[in-house]
Amino acid sequence: MTSAASHSADVVIVGGAVMGSSAAYHLLSDPGFKGRVIVVEKDPTYQLSASALSAASIRQQYSSAVNIRISLYGIQFLRSIGDRLAVDGDRPEIGLKEGGYLYCASEAGASVLAENQALQAAEGADILFLKPDELKARFPWLNVEDLAAGTWGRSGEGWFDGWGLLQAFRRKARSLGAEYVKGEVAEVEREGNAVVAVRLKDGTRIACGTLVNCAGSGGRALAEMAGVRIPVQAKRRYVFTFSCKEPVENCPLLIDTSGAYARPEGEGAFICGASPEADVDPDWFDEDPASQEIDFSFFEEFIWPSLAHRVPAFEAIRPGRAWSGPYDMCLLDHNAIVGQAGDVKNFYLCNGFSGHGLQQSPAIGRGLAELIVHGVFRTLDLSELGYERVLANRPLLERNVI
């Protein structure tokens, strides 16, 4: 971390985790950008960052074309990360494993799964629609008695080292000239319809030509400092680990009809989780130690029974460690808010990823850089994710939310 000695930058990015670091990297990689980039990060250990605490996976199985396209680029980026983010010949490794996602559906959900798969295939994603006998043939350990269908990502989906991705983006951005400053924004200064500076809690003032909000769980508060309201709330999510002695061969990231999920994490080891019902979904506050508490009854009473029903081998498991982390939920439609912030012409939003941030970071960082440097999206049109839909109360509905 450096100090902002000259107190000015062409672009100030608030939030130095995976999204902010991706934006910094893509900005400084653009031949059309010649400016200075300062990334303000309040906790350079990233101890409570969603990037570090995520289940770190990527899928193409969305119900909206823009999300599918974002992830199609994302998997291309992750496959070639060693070339893209190498620094002085040191190629980062993120242990990408393309084991696929397996969505399970009952009779009630089968038609939606079929519609989604048709769109995914039309966009070029390698997703198969499987009937119960086909599911059983591919995954003999799976209980299909109450299933009507499933969709499985034959390629292009899987999991990886999220911490490794964050560090690779950060290291590459710094090698290109990004300056990381430890600090927390206390104030955003505006003159008319433009942001002119941010002031940190230690009193440091950093003038800026452009301000980018990649502040994660602090994104709503930062937006409000700039006079912008976004429907984003940080929610608490738990990740539980367990081990299973009985082999569950070629296990993908399994999503049960109940919403519980599990994926392999090494030989005989798994991680799992689920989203609570809305009326019992706890908020997350970075400064509140209670936000880091773990509700083990949620695992014992809901997640474990759901997974054991779907995979009988999971009836006899050994629970392991667990952790909680922030999940920055877009309350409008569970989709990210990306782009220029309404009337504040030089303030850009990158918030509310609702659990999709790691996998979407390559495409979103690239898109933000294009918008800042060129004024338009040049490669992948992300305008459907823009702030305009918030102002118009026009949700971009996504049916595949975990």
What are the language-model segments listed below?
Residues 244-346:
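Active-site lid/adjacent beta-loop-alpha segment flanking the redox-cofactor pocket in flavoenzymes
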Residues 4-19, 38:
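Beta1/beta-strand and adjacent pyrophosphate-binding region of the FAD-binding site
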Residues 152-210, 218:
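Helical element adjacent to the flavin cofactor pocket in flavoenzyme catalytic cores
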